[in-house]
Amino acid sequence: MKENKYPMLMPLDIQMFGENKVRFGLKNVHYAVATEGAGGKLTYGTPERYPGAVSLSLEPRGETSEFYADDRVYYATTVNNGYEGTYEAAELPLKFRVDVIGDQLDETTGVLTETANSKPKTIALMFEFDGDVKATRHVLYNVTVSRPGTSGETKTESTEPTTQELSFIAAPTVDGVVKRATTGTTTPEVYDAWYTKVFEPTVVPTP
């Protein structure tokens, strides 16, 4: 075992921190509008809450390439192009429609206008899944949403609320980062501030 040069500091023992055995639930969905700077670097505004979370799913994007030799798969590689996702919520917030989708709100009449020239903004998307020990918080850094559809149904003996679904693509950033998530060893300072500011470590991995 390697000698601890700083006896007053305990080595990090992951087993000291509880890990979730199961995952359930979805809550605390937030988004932060991104601005692209020089070299494609993204900077983020203050996170805004997106209430009414019903479900969120992510499907990996990327291809697996296989090279055959000696009558077998000699080499295989997979490209990580991020995720394709869907987010189902109770209702699309007006602020999200204006700030992200690009709809135009007339402040005099209060009428919302969708135009053919509107372009969705890139956002960071944050959310958390609960667990038997502690909720795991996630952030996707380079998300582009598609214009949502709309639908409605007549009332029957029981009223079933209609939800809205957003489709989106979460691509890697120019630094190659797709997603980050908290763990059982995440510091309280980082965990508690997850929805205050988009988490960006000082050291960025090489893409």
What are these regions (language model features)?
Residues G18-R97, V145-E160:
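Solvent-exposed edge beta-strands and adjacent loop segments
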Residues T43-E48, R137-V143, R180-T185:
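Short amphipathic beta-strand/extended segments with alternating polar/hydrophobic composition
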Residues V145-P207:
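Mixed-charge, glycine-accented linear interaction segment located at domain edges/termini
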